[in-house]
Amino acid sequence: VQKDFPASVREIILSGCQGHCGSRPFYSKEEKKLAADAMEKMQITPLAKRCYRTLSGGQQQRVLLARALCATRKMLLLDEPVSGLDPKVTAEMYALIQKLNYEDGITVVMISHDLNAALQYASHILHIGDTVFFGSKAAYLNEFPQVWQKGGTAQ
């Protein structure tokens, strides 16, 4: 979404349903409910009529996550979803993403350079560096014990 795009939060979120619409020019009641539910999950319902470009970075991330929820109900692929956010908003976003995974059963595949967060929230780690690793957190820490010693960075 371009930052200058003059769409409301609700319109941006509804655009996630376009893959379900086919050639219909309007959204169905079910799609509108799906968007409303996604706004509720992301705790942004009061922002529904606001212009996307006037939102803070954290609010914009929540809008885009709500839009993604309208597009899929099974898996989210997130690329650095907390990039540029302050620590408080980062913690809130990770908590929302974790809730989607635990309570809604949505598989979350997330690209992150924040190894501490990955180790806190992920069930499995794919590490691509000088060596490649895929496995559980426990197996990762056995393979890379220096992670905790270096404050969450593995070489």
Q: Which residues fall in each region the model found?
A:
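Catalytic Walker B motif of ABC-type/P-loop ATPase nucleotide-binding domains
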Residues: 76-79
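H-loop/switch region of ABC-family ATPase nucleotide-binding domains
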Residues: 112-113
